[in-house]
């Protein structure tokens, strides 16, 4: 599995050229993309500026010597490469297994070309077998938890050891065990309109390419764009 993730990450790095501003994703597959960019900066003199999606990726990039800029200092990003926890047949996805979904979505939004790197196990018919992360403000989080419980979403607070995990943005994450999300777009809109929800892990209609690594090799899926 790790070998497949590495192949996907290294393949994505081939789309990066001199002078680009690039979004550096978070997670086990994006890790290999960032490593490969670091290698190219060091060995090939690749000139890029990175924008990171988590404190974890910031530390990784700094160690590798990748120059970084804050999201607030840029207007657009040429290319962002990130992982995904599930991708459905319509190229909607669930992200946030690494608890970085808010920063990931903020970086993805001004990106001209958004690429996901995954292994074949992440490609699914319907989203929802992977729990959907919902980032919520700490104030009123328990009340919101009860609302989700009443709606039948089977919520659970994301934990770190014995206490609730706190994200880089100082919020909690409630994971929803939905089983199958029949209409991710409608459910995304529902969560967008829920007071106390900062962001959710449904990335609908955002990705441009999905690089899938399997035992048979690497496939690059181009997402059809609505005309």
From Swiss-Prot:
Pathway given in the UniProt record: Carbohydrate degradation; pentose phosphate pathway; D-ribose 5-phosphate from D-ribulose 5-phosphate (non-oxidative stage): step 1/1
Active-site residues from the entry: 104 (proton acceptor)
Alphabetized GO MF terms: ribose-5-phosphate isomerase activity
Domain of life of the native organism: Bacteria
Keywords noted in UniProt: Isomerase
Xref: NCBIfam families: PRK00702.1, rpiA
Protein role: Catalyzes the reversible conversion of ribose-5-phosphate to ribulose 5-phosphate.
Family indicated by similarity: Belongs to the ribose 5-phosphate isomerase family.
Protein name (Swiss-Prot/TrEMBL): Ribose-5-phosphate isomerase A
Organism: Streptococcus pyogenes serotype M28 (strain MGAS6180)
The gene coding this protein: rpiA
